[in-house]
Amino acid sequence: MNTEASQDQTVTETPGVRLRQARESLGLTQQTVAERLCLKVSTIRDIEEDNAQANLASTFHRGYIRSYAKLVHLPEDELLPILEKQAPVRAAKVAPMQSFSLGKKHKKRDGWLMSFTWLIVLVVLGLTGAWWWQNHQAQQAEIANMVDQSSAQLSQNGGQPVPLTDDNSDAIAPTDAPAPVANGQPVPLTNHSTSAVTNSATTSSATTSSVPTTSSVPKTTLVPKTNSTEPVDTANTNTTMHQEGAASAAVSPSQVPQPGLSTGPSPLPTADAGVSGSTSSVGALVMNFTADCWLQVVDATGKTLFSGIQKGGAVLNLAGKAPYKLTIGAPGALTISYQGNPVDLSKFIKANRVARLTVGVE
């Protein structure tokens, strides 16, 4: 009987009961044991009551019991076999490894995505290039159209550039109009006479210094008698008489200009008859060309001051009635100043297009 009772007592003594008895024999509380083992009081209580936590792995549970046994001086070899019978070790669940084919599928999908992305980038670049090319072609066509219009205007004017004159410019005297003399006999002015007038006007200083006194005027410069019907050359005589007022007072009656003969100085063109003589007047435009450029300038009255192509290194001075409307084929090929102030063309240069602007607006 005693043997059976001892066996039942041994079976009933679980690891938790033995640990609790050893703790009580040492006079330790559950709180003290929890602090020494760095565990929760609830964990110590579950160990003494042989309650295995569901969320706690069996390996950790066995480790807690071994630490508890060392603390209360119990042999581990006596507790572990009982623990294995009571709570066998559970096999850990191992997740199955994924196949390498999944990685290949991801790579294949990423490859398609990158190909589609590159396709979109190439389409965007192609559209951008096509848009730029169309704008470039439109600008070139517009410049060519302007050049054709300028050439047509020049051909309509007989191949001569548009004259640049103002209200104060002198008119050119006709070269083939006959000059009337006394007795109704016309004295034709030949091309030789016209060239003589021009030469005498451009060399007025030399003519003034070389004119003799009234007492020594050569007879070859005198107008013939009124009953003469042969044409004479009167250009040098008229020019000399009007340049020398004192000499004309002492000329004989036969040398006095006849009624109907022009006595005023012949209007002569300046050295640059196509351009206004004054470049510093109010409303003047000065353009310095660094490269070949097509240009058209129209003043406030609608007059075309210039239309054509200027070569690099040229300087163009224009004067008219402000404001001016300018059309420039290549804005980067010139600099413009109006009344001494530079005109800003940077926005047209950056845009790389034909410049259309108005200068001199008050």
Curated annotation (Swiss-Prot):
Top-rank lineage group of the source organism: Bacteria
Compositional bias (Low complexity): 193-221, 246-259
Pfam families: HTH_25, RodZ_C
Disulphide connectivity of cysteines: none
GO BP of this protein: regulation of cell shape
Molecular function via GO: DNA binding
Record-annotated membrane-spanning stretches: 112-132
Stretches the record annotates as Disordered: 151-277
DNA-binding region: 30-49
Start-end of Polar residues biased regions: 223-242
UniProt KW keywords: Cell inner membrane, Cell membrane, Cell shape, DNA-binding, Membrane, Signal-anchor, Transmembrane, Transmembrane helix
Family annotation (PROSITE patterns): HTH_CROC1
Side Cytoplasmic, residues: 1-111
All copies of domain HTH cro/C1-type, residue ranges: 19-79
Transmembrane helix is among the record's keywords: yes
UniProt xrefs under InterPro entries: Bact_Cytoskel_RodZ, Cro/C1-type_HTH, Lambda_DNA-bd_dom_sf, RodZ, RodZ-like_C
Keyword hit for Cell membrane: yes
Membrane topology annotation: Single-pass type II membrane protein
Description of its domains: The helix-turn-helix (HTH) motif in the cytoplasmic domain of the N-terminus is involved in the formation of spirals to maintain the rigid rod shape. As this protein is anchored in the cytoplasmic membrane, the HTH motif may contribute to protein-protein interactions to form the RodZ helix, which is localized beneath the cytoplasmic membrane. The C-terminal domain may be critical for determination of the rod shape by probably interacting with enzymes required for synthesis of the peptidoglycan layer, including PBPs in the periplasm.
Family the entry assigns: Belongs to the RodZ family.
Function comment: Cytoskeletal protein that is involved in cell-shape control through regulation of the length of the long axis.
Name assigned to this protein: Cytoskeleton protein RodZ
